[in-house]
């Protein structure tokens, strides 16, 4: 097949259509988003809620979002750094923290709607695959609050942390349509879920196992990797109890605020902190002087 060079003439540019900004930036999958937000045409004023999950290097962001013409509206949000208020101070981006963050969001959403007593979810997680069902009330049968998982551009591989958030929100009392084939412990060949493996991940058992293995094999690396755990006397044996207690506290008060012992920084201090890493813009004279200095340096090196 002959090679045809793409001619970018005036006609090409006049007819060129730019893609959406967030597509150009690689932030939004509009093919998926269209299907997530499109509502049935025979429903009016019935918002379609999405459980939005995003991961950063140090945090997990979970939001309950609905889409409107003017833009997305956030009904409630929960972040993994808020887990410090419930005793979880380390490993705020692991699978167990993802589960706890999902649970925190679910309890907040239901508390705001006044449904937290009607839909309690799974109070003691055992790794079983469950979906939130309708509850019997004095006024008759009440359907649960429904949301759809929105993972953005994250990989949906088996055992991914996004499904930890989903499991936490599901156990928290929200109905999220899903199957068991993406949880840790699911065997593709037998098509069965090992509930013990999933339970281990919920309570941070995989972290505890790694801590014990590393402590035996490479003590120096263990001390450097888990230095914060060691400083706070958090041992591998105590992790399960720590997460179980955090789950109880989240259910008791999902709106608890974390109060840090460190003194609060003023606006001036934060500004000075940010300016520390920001390079000052050089003036024309400074740029010219810098170029002249480099030329002199090069000439001196050549003479040598």
UniProtKB/Swiss-Prot annotation:
Gene3D superfamilies assigned to the protein according to its UniProt record, in alphabetical order: 3.30.420.100
Keyword set, alphabetical order: Cytoplasm, Ribonucleoprotein, Ribosomal protein
Gene Ontology BP, a term: ribosomal large subunit assembly
One Pfam assignment: Ribosomal_L18_c
GO MF term set: 5S rRNA binding; structural constituent of ribosome
Top-level division of the source organism's lineage: Eukaryota
Subcellular locations according to the entry: Cytoplasm
InterPro entries associated with the record: Rbsml_uL18_euk, Ribosomal_uL18_C_euk
Main location: cytoplasm
One CC-aspect GO term: cytosolic large ribosomal subunit
UniProt-listed CDD domains: Ribosomal_L18_L5e
Role description: Component of the ribosome, a large ribonucleoprotein complex responsible for the synthesis of proteins in the cell. The small ribosomal subunit (SSU) binds messenger RNAs (mRNAs) and translates the encoded message by selecting cognate aminoacyl-transfer RNA (tRNA) molecules. The large subunit (LSU) contains the ribosomal catalytic site termed the peptidyl transferase center (PTC), which catalyzes the formation of peptide bonds, thereby polymerizing the amino acids delivered by tRNAs into a polypeptide chain.
Family the entry assigns: Belongs to the universal ribosomal protein uL18 family.
Assembly behavior: Component of a hexameric 5S RNP precursor complex, composed of 5S RNA, RRS1, RPF2, RPL5, RPL11 and SYO1; this complex acts as a precursor for ribosome assembly.
Stated name of the protein: Large ribosomal subunit protein uL18
């Amino acid at each position: 097949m002959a090679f045809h060079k793409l001619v970018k003439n005036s006609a090409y540019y006049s007819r060129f259509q730019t893609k959406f900004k967030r597509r150009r930036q690689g932030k939004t999958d509009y093919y998926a988003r269209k299907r997530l937000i499109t509502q049935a045409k025979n429903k009016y004023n019935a918002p379609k809620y999405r459980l939005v999950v995003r991961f950063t290097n140090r945090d997990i962001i979970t939001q309950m979002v609905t889409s409107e013409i003017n833009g997305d509206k956030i009904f409630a949000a929960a972040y993994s750094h808020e887990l410090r208020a419930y005793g979880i101070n380390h490993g705020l981006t692991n699978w167990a923290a993802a589960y706890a963050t999902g649970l925190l969001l679910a309890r907040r959403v239901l508390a705001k709607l006044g449904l937290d007593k009607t839909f309690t979810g799974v109070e003691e997680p055992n790794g079983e695959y469950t979906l939130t069902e309708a509850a019997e009330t004095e006024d008759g049968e009440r359907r649960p609050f429904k949301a759809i998982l929105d993972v953005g551009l994250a990989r949906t591989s088996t055992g991914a942390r996004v499904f930890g958030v989903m499991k936490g929100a599901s156990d928290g009392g929200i109905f999220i349509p899903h199957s068991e084939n993406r949880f840790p412990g699911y065997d593709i060949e037998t098509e069965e879920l090992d509930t013990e493996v999933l339970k281990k991940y919920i309570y941070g058992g995989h972290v505890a196992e790694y801590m014990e293995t590393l402590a035996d094999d490479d003590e120096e690396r263990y001390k450097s990797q888990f230095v914060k755990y060691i400083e706070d006397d958090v041992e591998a044996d105590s992790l399960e109890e720590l997460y179980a207690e955090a789950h109880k506290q989240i259910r008791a008060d999902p709106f608890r605020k974390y109060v840090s012992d460190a003194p609060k920084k003023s606006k001036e201090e934060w500004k000075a902190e940010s300016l520390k890493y920001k390079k000052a813009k050089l003036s024309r004279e400074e740029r010219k002087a810098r170029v002249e200095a480099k030329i002199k340096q090069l000439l001196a090196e050549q003479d040598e």
